[in-house]
Each structure stands twice: as structure tokens, then as C-alpha cells.
Amino acid sequence: MRPAQTNQFDYVKIGLASPERIRQWGERTLPNGQVVGEVTKPETINYRTLKPEMDGLFCERIFGPKDWECHCGKYKESVIEVLSVSAVVLEVTESRVRRHRMGYIKLAAPVAHVGYSKAFLAIFHSVGYALRDVEQIVYFNSYVVLSPGNAETLTYKQLLSEDQWLEIEDQIYSEDSLLQGVEVGIGAEALLRLLADINLEQEAESLREEIGNAKGQKRAKLIKRLRVIDNFIATGSKPEWMVMAVIPVIPPDLRPMVQLDGGRFATSDLNDLYRRVINRNNRLARLQEILAPEIIVRNEKRMLQEAVDALIDNGRRGRTVVGANNRPLKSLSDIIEGKQGRFRQNLLGKRVDYSGRSVIVVGPKLKIHQCGLPREMAIELFQPFVINRLIRSGMVIHQAAPMISRNDPSVWDVLEEVIEGHPVMLNRAPTLHRLGIQSFEPILVEGRAIQLHPLVCPAFNADFDGDQMAVHVPLSLESQAEARLLMLASNNILSPATGKPIITPSQDMVLGAYYLTAENPGATKGAGKYFSSLEDVIMAFQQEQIDLHAYIYVRFDGEIESDQPDTEPVKVTENEDGTRTLLYKFRRVRQDAKGNVLSQYIYTTPGRVIYNNAIQEALAS
């Protein structure tokens, strides 16, 4: 038994890594005292033995061996010790370490990180470098003055062309030269020197003074630059770390090489990009050893810079590196960024159990807190609950499971019991606000489409032209309670963004409300008739004795509201029995001698009576 490793951490922090930190990631000391970690060879595996090459991109000494087996295969099983076998010293341990052990490449010349182009501009704001100027230095097109010495024509950080530098060089090396202390550099080494000379506190102070006097767009740019420098100071990062002297090599199991059926190998694009870097780095180191001409060394440094650029972000600058079939190779940035990247695809978009997905169709007969769940989907999602209920009824699991697979009729009754009061959550991508995922009470329906109440569509931004939605089943009692109390559609009527109702009548509801309450002078059937109650009106309409839009009188002794003032009677009639009848625009009132209301008939249409009745029933329920 091996002790379980518990890696506890509070948070993940992304920042600049120093060369020492990168070296620490990859360096390990074997139990015999040997320090390993540097990848020096571009080879991956030996084509004859099919074993990883030592000090190569898949080296077992650097990244760890196959499961409990040494390089030559002599020692196997759980031998946790260092073995010197076939002149190869390695640690026999589990292969899982090949997923997290890193290596590093020590560069023969520093290279600039292509991802920090804009950060370079923020650091060099006082000089007024443009992005093109920084690139000219890095890619060996322009020289930069590192120290002007006693030359009056030169200034610190001034850019020089090839011709200008040759002219100054002639002056420096002439016999009667008076120039002293002049230093000029080119490439990432010059950039490294400039960055190392920067005092961040002074830069921040001068920026704050400039911001006080600046206005408009210039002020906004200065604030952006100050924010970058303040972040450097706050995190303790140094600007020179943006120029790399050491490159990390990610674990081999994250850039695998797989043998195909025909004996050929399929490999990750990263291996090709790493191989280019190592080849160019080794070639540069050899050229420096043999003291090759400066122009050749400089060209090799530029090629190394381009190889590292392609590894970090292929195609961002210069020519895109392509593999077989002219396909661009996937760099480290391509793996991380975008919809198919590591974050959005694998970390934020994991597939989960107890979930399903289907097309949505309208369910007009559903209540707002209900959704139609296809039987086929429901039996799969609620299978553990169904089996549990069958076992509690006296069955054994070997009887219960086959009943579901053969669609036994008794299973559907159990499923009905199981889903009663068990909410499910519906989610429609993209989930842009919290109402993009809500819970509903499932109702079993035939077919294979999820039925959705039309009023919740605005919250999901859903329509029925082929949209799909995901279903998730909350398992624990706590999650079910939260789904019911917090996430139920009937509890989410107001928009969290504006506070206004997001569930509002739409489409056929608006049309129906308009049609019921509209006026139609052509509707004369039953017009002018009197009815003793609202129920009598509905009954007469159902028996086709009156038109939907015919104006009638119906007795209603309660209070009425109108959008038009109706307080002055149009006509008053005194009756023989001492009562009087007041005729208003929209009602007819009969009062006794003391002015008490004996009866009230309102002037309306059967459509409005039906509409009022529907609202009253909804409020009562």
C-alpha cells in the first residue's frame, strides 16, 4: 500500500516565473545525489528498442519511468530504490509521475517572451517605443544604445540602424578615437539589459506626475501603463523575467506519442515545436564554442527566438510553423485559449453524470414551474432512484435492473412515484446570467423532445427553432431543496439585472387577451340583454346565445375599476316605488330613497367577462 498524497492549496495564482523558479520546476535530485532535469537532446524514442532516449523529450530519468520498471526491464514490481542498470541511473516508481514531472531547456542565449509585447511597451513608456521598435531589437533588425559613454550624438535607449552602428563602430576602433564607454546591443540580450536597469518605483512616480497633467486619451494610456507597473511592484515580479533564459518542458504524458496499428507513431505537435527549439539551441551553443563569426551566431539567435515564439504562440508573429498537410502546429497558447482550449473545454465544460440533452418544443398546457421530460430520458436519469424503490419493495438488484432494460410496464408506475416532487434543472447554453439555469417539476411525456413553458423562454433566450437544452438531476436532499426554493421558475419572475419582470405575457397570450377585450360593432347577437350573474354570461356564450363581443348588461354589485372616469350619470330616472335608476356610461345603478345601492349592472362584453374570470381564478389559486 502506498500512502495517498493530499495536495492541499488555497488558490491558483498566475504570474511571471523567474529563471530560478523554472529550473526548480524541472530539477530533481535522485536518491544517489545526481541532479537531473535538463533536456539536452531533441530525440523522443529509439526507433529500434522503442524506449525513450536518455536526456531526450521523453527521458525516463528526467520525467520518471514506466510503472515500477527500470529502463532495461531487469527490475520490476515495487522496488523503490535507485538502480544503476545498463549504466543508466533512474528511480523505479509509478508512471503516474510522468503526468506532472517537468523538465527544462537551458538556452544558449536569452529570448523574449512573445506574449509580453504590450508589457514591454508599458515598461518603456518614457522612451516612447512602439511595438515595432521592440520587435526590431528582438529580431536583430535594430541596435539599441545601452550606454552612450562620452558620445554627444548618442542617448540612452536610442535605436540605431545597421549603417549607423557601422559608422559609430568605425569611430570607436579608429586610432585617434576619443569615444569611450559606448555600449550598443541587439536582440533579447539587449532587451534583458534594458529591463534589468529599470527602477520600477521611479517609473511609477514619473507616470503619476504625467497623469496629473495629462487629459483625454493620453491620460487613459498612461493609467493603463501605470497599472502594469504597479502590478509588477505588488507581485514582486521583475521586468527582466519577461526575457527567458530557461524554458520549461511540460510532462511527457501531456504531449504523448502513440504507436498506431501500422507501426507508425502519432505525436503531439508540441514535441515537434520543442524539437525545433532544442536543435537550434544546441546548434547555437556549438557555434559559440567554436567562436563562429558574429553574423552567423546572430542569425542562429534570431532563429532560436522564432522557434521559442512558435512554441509559445505559433503564428502570432512571423511565418506560421506547419506540419504534415500544411496544417499549423498547435502551440501552448492554442492548447489553452479559445472554446476548444483547456479551460473552456475541459475545466469549465466537463461532462457530468445524471444529465441529458434534447431539443425543446413548446408545452402550452404546462404550468410555469413544470417541464415535459421524455420517458426515455427520465428512466435513464432516474434509474438509481427507480432501482432503489424496486429493491425497497422486496426485489433484488438482479431482478430490478433487467426490468428497466426490457421496459416492464410496472417500471413506469414506479418512475411516476420517483419523479413526483423531485425537481430537475434545465440549462440552455450560453448561460449568460443566473436565469440561464432554472429548476422545474418534471412531467413524463411521450416523444423525445423536452417540453418547455413558453413564458420562461425570455429568461433562457430560447426559441423553438431547434434549440437544445441540458437536463441535470439534483441528487442530495439539500440540492433538491435549493432547486425547489431558489431555482424554481415560478420563483424567478424578476430579472436580476434590471429588477423588471422577465416573465411577461407574449405572443398568443397577448393576442388572446386583445381578442377577448376588443370591441366589434358588428357583433349584435344578444346585444342589450340583461344577466343576473357572470356565470350566466359564460353559460349563455357557451350555448351560442350571445356573441363574444356583443355589449350586454350583467349584474355585479362589487367595486369596478375603469381607465376612464365614470362618476357622472348620463341620465337619472325616478321610479314610482321611490327608487331611482342612474345610467352611467359603463354601468346602470339602482338606488333606494336614501341613496343606498340596490343593484348594479355593468355594461360589458362576454369576452371581458371570460378574461376577468380567468384572472380571478389565477389569483385565487
UniProtKB/Swiss-Prot annotation:
GO terms for cellular component: DNA-directed RNA polymerase complex. Its cofactor is Mg(2+). Its EC number is 2.7.7.6. It holds the Pfam family RNA_pol_Rpb1_1. Keywords: DNA-directed RNA polymerase, Magnesium, Metal-binding, Nucleotidyltransferase, Transcription, Transferase. This is DNA-directed RNA polymerase subunit gamma. Binds 1 Mg(2+) ion per subunit. InterPro entries: DNA-dir_RpoC1_gamma (IPR012755), DNA-dir_RpoC_beta_prime (IPR045867), RNA_pol_asu (IPR000722), RNA_pol_N (IPR006592), RNA_pol_Rpb1_1 (IPR007080), RNA_pol_Rpb1_3 (IPR007066), RNA_pol_Rpb1_3_sf (IPR042102), RNA_pol_Rpb1_clamp_domain (IPR044893). The gene is rpoC1. Belongs to the RNA polymerase beta' chain family. RpoC1 subfamily. NCBIfam families: PRK02625.1 (NF002729), rpoC1_cyan (TIGR02387). Gene3D superfamilies: 1.10.40.90, 2.40.40.20, RNA polymerase II, clamp domain (4.10.860.120), RNA polymerase Rpb1, domain 3 (1.10.274.100). It comes from Nostoc commune. In cyanobacteria the RNAP catalytic core is composed of 2 alpha, 1 beta, 1 beta', 1 gamma and 1 omega subunit. When a sigma factor is associated with the core the holoenzyme is formed, which can initiate transcription. It catalyses: RNA(n) + a ribonucleoside 5'-triphosphate = RNA(n+1) + diphosphate. Mg(2+) binds at D463, D465, D467. GO terms for molecular function: DNA binding; DNA-directed RNA polymerase activity; magnesium ion binding.
